[in-house]
């Protein structure tokens, strides 16, 4: 049987891994200037868009928080997988 403590530890490891991966891909999203964010976003996420289109997108999305969205998705997927493991072990 899998203990809740082990499930929690596994979840924390996955979130830490996800954060590390995220920060290695998008270090400029934390405390960076808008031009740099625009350039990196364009390279990583919107290669077919112009700089102005990416900047317009950022200006239209003031509440956009890719880190929060990524963590929510990772947490959901981790919970699903760990829940399945717990159920199988039980």
Regions found by a protein language model. Give the residues of each.
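Residue-level recognition of conserved structural "scaffold" positions that shape functional pockets
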Residues: 21, 88-90
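Acidic, low-complexity, intrinsically disordered interaction modules
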Residues: 26-88
């Amino acid at each position: 049987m899998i203990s809740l403590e082990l499930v929690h530890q596994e979840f924390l490891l996955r979130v830490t891994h996800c954060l590390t991966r995220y920060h290695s891909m998008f270090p400029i999203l934390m405390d960076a200037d808008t031009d740099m964010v625009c350039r990196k976003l364009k390279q990583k996420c919107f290669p077919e868009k112009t700089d102005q289109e990416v900047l317009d997108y950022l200006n239209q999305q003031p509440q956009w928080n890719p880190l929060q969205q990524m963590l929510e998705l990772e947490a959901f997927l981790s919970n699903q997988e760990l829940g399945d493991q717990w159920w199988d072990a039980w």
